[in-house]
């Protein structure tokens, strides 16, 4: 199963190929996507993305995980989350969201099992 491309991105809105849903923040993996609801894990801009935020995507068997920190990079990614991913053997890319989407789509079109978590506002 391939990773769906992100079809569009604008402030507060993301569309994923194969889905009719418009996401504010989303998780994407080979074969699917869904809302990234920060309330599920108590996530806030700081301390930021926690292992619990990426665990679902990791469990889908991704080789690379792309994290979009927001348009202004307000969302933090603590070293503990990066270490968690590295210990799982996953290459992690942490970028501003527009750059993260470009990176994710480039990897997806190459057929790489890539996943992502993306924050589409600040």
Swiss-Prot record:
UniProt keyword terms in alphabetical order: Cytoplasm
Any GO CC annotation of this UniProt entry: cytoplasm
GO process annotations (BP): positive regulation of fat cell differentiation
Region described as MTH138-like domain: 6-122
Pfam families, sorted: DUF498
CDD domains to which the protein is assigned, alphabetical: Mth938 (cd05126)
Top-rank lineage group of the source organism: Eukaryota
Gene3D superfamilies: MTH938-like
Subcellular localization, as worded in the UniProt entry: Cytoplasm
InterPro entries found in the cross-reference section: AAMDC, MTH938-like_sf, NDUFAF3/AAMDC
Described function: May play a role in preadipocyte differentiation and adipogenesis.
PANTHER family in the record: MTH938 DOMAIN-CONTAINING PROTEIN
Family: Belongs to the AAMDC family.
The name this protein goes by in its record: Mth938 domain-containing protein
Name of the coding gene: AAMDC
């Amino acid at each position: 199963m391939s990773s769906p491309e992100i079809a569009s991105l604008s402030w507060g809105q993301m569309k994923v190929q194969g889905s009719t849903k418009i996401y504010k923040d989303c998780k994407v993996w080979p074969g699917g996507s869904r809302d990234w609801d920060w309330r599920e894990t108590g996530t806030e801009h700081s301390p930021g993305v926690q292992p619990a935020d990426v665990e679902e995507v990791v469990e889908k068997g991704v080789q690379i995980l792309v994290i979009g920190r927001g348009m202004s990079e307000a969302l933090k990614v603590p070293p503990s989350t990066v270490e968690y991913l590295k210990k799982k053997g996953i290459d992690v890319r942490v970028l501003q969201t527009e750059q993260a989407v470009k990176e994710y789509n480039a990897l997806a079109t190459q057929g790489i099992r890539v996943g992502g978590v993306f924050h589409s506002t600040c």
